């Protein structure tokens, strides 16, 4: 599924994301996954991969097998569904631990300017 910008904003609100950080989250998602829930990235230099709307990494956060594991206690395939509840819970856990530093897409594109969501 690909969200529109406002569709993403509405879904993130539904998932309980902090309104004060909403533009950061939208920017992160737009730069990491282009708002696609099922995106699997190319292999990273360290051999890991990133999954889903928030591009969550399998080195630390999700398990590649069929048994949920790692720090979010989920399988990576659970991060690829149109229902973003599991992915959102994991993304918020990552944020709580590292702020936005875990995401190069945020670091490279969102640190100083964020998208306009005032019409949403």
UniProtKB/Swiss-Prot annotation:
Q: Report the record's disulfide bonds.
A: 6-120, 27-110, 62-76, 72-90
UniProt-listed InterPro entries:
Glyco_hydro_22, Glyco_hydro_22_CS, Glyco_hydro_22_lys, Lysozyme-like_dom_sf
GO process terms (BP): defense response to bacterium; killing of cells of another organism
Per the Swiss-Prot or TrEMBL record, the active site comprises: 32, 50
Q: Which reactions does this protein catalyse? A: Hydrolysis of (1->4)-beta-linkages between N-acetylmuramic acid and N-acetyl-D-glucosamine residues in a peptidoglycan and between N-acetyl-D-glucosamine residues in chitodextrins
> What family does the Swiss-Prot or TrEMBL record give for this protein?
Belongs to the glycosyl hydrolase 22 family.
Protein name stated in the entry: Lysozyme
What is the native source organism of this protein?
Antheraea mylitta
